[in-house]
């Protein structure tokens, strides 16, 4: 009974659910004894040993499941840690790779600078100790690869150390001379004369003093004996010698050109005295026999045609080939050296000056000062550049050029490097062959095509067609006049990207409001502090231009509006500003031309065409060649020149006026050439005509567009003409050849009108157009 009750009591004391049966156990046993054996068997079955084992197994299984889940979570975290470590290692490898590339590019840039400096000036560029980039060995490599990389690092250190030794001893130039001599000797193309010259060169380089030669020989012998075993395994001496002579071998220059340039460089750096060959020289040269193997390797790496080039060069070196007095050549060399020393501080002419010179050269039949052909020093086309040609090239560099203000904005930006490195188009000038004149004309016209104007800014703030525009003379600022009764000022440096196009949008920084009708014309003063506008209300409003950096949301400034110039009774069609006299010209639909002072708001000083003999003026401009004259076009097809001082009409330009067709002879715009006495007119019949202001004769007439020509503008240098038309196109013309060099569509049509005005910036690389589609576009 006790043995059977023991497990039950133990179970009831330990099991949490048996607390209620702890005191009922004896009563149950008594009841079981009184009721029968069946009740006692049921009580014993509830606390049996299999039940305990089942409970333990259940708890153990639950513990194992939780442990498995913990291990899974730990494995996931370890995998995440490994992934992050791998990502970090990848970033470090990427950083190392980028650092290596940066070092490589820096080294390549230094080599490129040295190359261009050598080609341009003929001397080496001092950039300090220009060593190839050294990279640290990767830490993650296997142990088998580390000894090899360490040995390579030791090789590099050995090369650098030996290079320093050679520089200290002074063997740099010697190795160059001996190397070139060995190559010619191996190829079998050296003649007696060249051998003697080479021996003299080697004597002058090696035999500075007898003590130096002996000391050099002793140092060379000791180095060779100590490093014989190293030379058997490593051939870094070959690479070191190649680095001295072929630093730019990686570039697109063959060995022949490189050797010629190196030879000339050595000649310029060290004048070679006339010394004879002696025993010390031969002994010193014997120490460089180990370079024969390196020369054979270099010979294999050169192209197959180098042997012929060496032969040609050696033949060129012989004076018998040229029948030239050696004294004359020596004298020319000395003269060239003096000129080069005196011209080191002289800056090469820029692109605009070269263009001025080319424009002047086109009108000259012969150029006696340039009889020999001039080759560009930046792009050598032959294996040898004669000393005479080099001196002539320096004479061309010393020529004076006429001043130019801003012609560089016509040409492309990619010529900036070319203008700094060479003579540009002057490299192809030859006056010996007269048949080259046509090719020169074609090349000069081709240069004008290099600059392609592309749309840059789109000005979208006006609500109606834009009638006129004017650039600030200095700043990148534009003022537009529109039919929506307003003028707007734009700062082209304050841009914002457009939503659906590659061009940039510019918001106006100021809006001028005073006109009671459409604004038809606008002009700025020479200093950019005032602007004047005319409209259909017959008023000429005078404005003070605001600061280009003004906040568009600043409070209203009443001082901007200076006041109206009263006098016209109908629409003002055109304005022109005279910087020389500070006067303003205006033409109006009332048939008069008026001259105003700009220093104050006052009535007109002079009135022209009171009787309307020539018709109603449509356009007016100042004659640039004579500031006291003005030119105006009229509705009847006449163009006349007036003297503003005497108030008299002095000349009426030639015109074929047909009274029956008044619309076809209408002149929409007249402008004056900025440097020549020429007037240019734009006609309703699609023509552009050129007139001589002195004689009034028609110089040239051409059909320029498919529809009426509405606007004209000439660049500040007077080389290019820009025209706008109602056919939606803007065309750029070469004024010398009267040919179109570029055409682009700028605006859309509205009420059969398209482009109202075009303009060049006086000092910056901008052109602008105003259209009937309420847009103004700026091109660069």
UniProtKB/Swiss-Prot annotation:
Gene Ontology cellular-component annotations: bicellular tight junction; cytoplasm; dendrite; dendritic spine; FAR/SIN/STRIPAK complex; glutamatergic synapse; neuronal cell body; postsynapse
Keyword line: Calmodulin-binding, Cell projection, Coiled coil, Cytoplasm, Membrane, Phosphoprotein, Repeat, Synapse, WD repeat
SUPFAM superfamilies: WD40 repeat-like
Summary of the tissues where the protein is detected: Mainly expressed in the central nervous system. Mostly confined in dendrites, not in axons, and is most abundant in dendritic spines.
PANTHER family xref list: STRIATIN
Segments of this protein annotated with the region Caveolin-binding: 55-63
Membrane topology annotation: Peripheral membrane protein
WD repeats mapped onto the chain: 461-500, 514-553, 567-606, 662-701, 704-743, 750-780
Gene Ontology terms describing biological process: dendrite development; locomotory behavior; negative regulation of cell population proliferation; regulation of modification of postsynaptic structure; regulation of signal transduction; Wnt signaling pathway
Modified residues (Phosphoserine): 137, 227, 229, 245, 259
Subunit structure, as described in the record: Part of the core of STRIPAK complexes composed of PP2A catalytic and scaffolding subunits, the striatins (PP2A regulatory subunits), the striatin-associated proteins MOB4, STRIP1 and STRIP2, PDCD10 and members of the STE20 kinases, such as STK24 and STK26. Interacts with CTTNBP2; this interaction may regulate dendritic spine distribution of STRN. Activation of glutamate receptors weakens the interaction with CTTNBP2.
Family (UniProt): Belongs to the WD repeat striatin family.
Compartment list: Cytoplasm; Membrane; Cell projection, Dendritic spine
Modified positions (Phosphothreonine) in chain numbering: 225
UniProt feature coiled coil, ranges: 53-120
UniProt region (Disordered), positions on chain: 124-145, 290-321, 334-353, 363-388
Protein name: Striatin
Regions of compositional bias (Basic residues) in chain numbering: 338-351
InterPro entries noted in UniProt: G-protein_beta_WD-40_rep, Striatin_N, WD40/YVTN_repeat-like_dom_sf, WD40_repeat_CS, WD40_repeat_dom_sf, WD40_rpt, WD_repeat_striatin
Family matches, as PROSITE patterns: WD_REPEATS_1 (PS00678), WD_REPEATS_2 (PS50082), WD_REPEATS_REGION (PS50294)
Compositional bias per record (Basic and acidic residues), positions renumbered to this chain: 299-315
Domain of life: Eukaryota
Annotated GO MF terms: armadillo repeat domain binding; calcium-dependent protein binding; calmodulin binding; nuclear estrogen receptor binding; protein domain specific binding; protein phosphatase 2A binding; protein-containing complex binding
Record function comment: Calmodulin-binding scaffolding protein which is the center of the striatin-interacting phosphatase and kinase (STRIPAK) complexes. STRIPAK complexes have critical roles in protein (de)phosphorylation and are regulators of multiple signaling pathways including Hippo, MAPK, nuclear receptor and cytoskeleton remodeling. Different types of STRIPAK complexes are involved in a variety of biological processes such as cell growth, differentiation, apoptosis, metabolism and immune regulation.
Chain residue ranges for the region called Calmodulin-binding: 149-166
């Amino acid at each position: 009974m006790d043995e059977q009750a023991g497990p039950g009591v133990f179970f009831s004391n330990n099991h949490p659910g048996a607390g209620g049966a702890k005191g009922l156990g004896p009563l149950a046993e008594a009841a079981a004894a009184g009721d029968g054996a069946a009740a006692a068997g049921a009580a014993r079955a509830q606390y049996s040993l299999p039940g305990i084992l089942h409970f333990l197994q259940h708890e153990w299984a639950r513990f194992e499941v939780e442990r498995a889940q913990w291990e899974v979570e730990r494995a996931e975290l370890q995998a995440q840690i490994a992934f992050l470590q791998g990502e970090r290692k990848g970033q470090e490898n990427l950083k190392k790779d980028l650092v290596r590339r940066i070092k490589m590019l820096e080294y390549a840039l230094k080599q490129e600078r040295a190359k261009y400096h050598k080609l341009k000036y003929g001397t080496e560029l001092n950039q300090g100790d220009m060593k190839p980039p050294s990279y640290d060995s990767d830490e993650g490599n296997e142990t088998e690869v580390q000894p090899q990389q360490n040995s390579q690092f030791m090789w590099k250190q050995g090369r650098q150390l030996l290079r320093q030794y050679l520089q200290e001893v002074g063997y740099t130039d010697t190795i160059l001379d001996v190397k070139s001599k060995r190559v010619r000797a191996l190829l079998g193309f050296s003649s007696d004369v060249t051998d003697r010259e080479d021996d003299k060169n080697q004597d002058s380089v090696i035999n500075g003093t007898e003590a130096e030669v002996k000391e050099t020989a002793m140092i060379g012998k000791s180095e060779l004996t100590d490093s014989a075993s190293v030379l058997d395994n490593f051939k870094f001496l070959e690479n070191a010698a190649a680095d001295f002579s072929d630093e730019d071998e990686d570039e697109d220059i063959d060995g022949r050109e490189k050797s010629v340039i190196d030879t000339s460089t050595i000649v310029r750096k060290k004048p070679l005295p006339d010394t004879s060959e002696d025993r010390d020289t031969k002994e010193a040269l014997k120490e460089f026999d180990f370079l024969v193997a390196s020369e054979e390797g270099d010979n294999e790496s050169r192209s197959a045609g180098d042997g012929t080039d060496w032969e040609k060069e050696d033949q060129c070196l012989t004076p018998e080939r040229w029948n030239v007095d050696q004294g004359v050549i020596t004298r020319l060399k000395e003269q060239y050296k003096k000129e080069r020393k005196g011209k080191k501080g002289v800056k090469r002419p820029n692109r605009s000056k070269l263009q001025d010179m080319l424009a002047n050269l086109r009108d000259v039949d012969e150029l006696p000062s340039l009889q020999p052909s001039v080759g560009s020093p930046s792009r050598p086309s032959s294996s040898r550049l004669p000393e005479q040609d080099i001196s002539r090239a320096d004479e061309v560099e010393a020529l004076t050029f006429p001043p130019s203000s801003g012609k560089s904005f016509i040409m492309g930006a990619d010529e900036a490097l070319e203008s700094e490195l060479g003579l540009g188009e002057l490299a192809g000038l030859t006056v010996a062959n007269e048949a080259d004149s046509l090719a020169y004309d074609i090349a000069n016209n081709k240069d004008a095509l290099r600059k392609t104007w592309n749309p840059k800014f789109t000005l979208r703030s006006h609500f109606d067609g834009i009638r006129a525009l004017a650039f600030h003379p200095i700043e990148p600022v534009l003022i537009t006049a529109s039919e929506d009764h307003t003028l707007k000022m734009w700062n082209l440096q304050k841009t914002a990207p457009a939503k659906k196009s590659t061009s940039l949008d510019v918001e106006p920084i100021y809006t001028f409001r005073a006109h009671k009708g459409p604004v038809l014309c606008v002009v700025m003063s020479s200093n950019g502090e005032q602007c004047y506008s005319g409209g259909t209300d017959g008023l000429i409003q005078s404005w003070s231009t605001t600061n280009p950096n003004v906040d568009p949301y600043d409070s209203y400034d009443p001082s901007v509006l200076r006041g109206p110039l009263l006098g016209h009774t109908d629409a003002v069609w055109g304005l022109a500003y005279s910087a020389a006299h500070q006067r303003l010209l205006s033409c109006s639909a009332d048939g008069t031309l008026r001259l105003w002072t700009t220093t104050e708001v006052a009535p007109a000083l002079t009135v022209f065409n009171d009787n309307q003999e020539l018709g109603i003026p449509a356009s007016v401009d100042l004659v640039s060649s004579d500031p006291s004259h003005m030119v105006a076009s009229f509705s009847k097809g006449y163009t006349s020149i007036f003297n503003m001082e005497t108030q008299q009409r002095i000349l009426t330009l030639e015109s074929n006026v047909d009274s029956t067709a008044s619309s076809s002879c209408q002149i929409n715009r007249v402008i004056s050439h900025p440097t020549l006495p020429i007037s240019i007119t734009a006609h309703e019949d699609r023509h552009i005509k050129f007139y001589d202001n002195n004689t009034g004769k028609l110089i040239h007439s051409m059909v320029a567009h498919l529809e009426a020509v509405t606007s004209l503008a000439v660049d500040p240098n007077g080389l290019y003409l820009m025209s706008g038309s109602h056919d939606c196109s803007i065309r750029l013309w070469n004024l010398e050849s009267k040919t179109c060099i570029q055409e682009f569509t700028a605006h859309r049509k509205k009420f059969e009108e398209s482009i109202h005005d075009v303009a060049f910036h006086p000092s910056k690389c901008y052109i602008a157009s105003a259209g009937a589609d309420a847009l103004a576009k700026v091109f660069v």
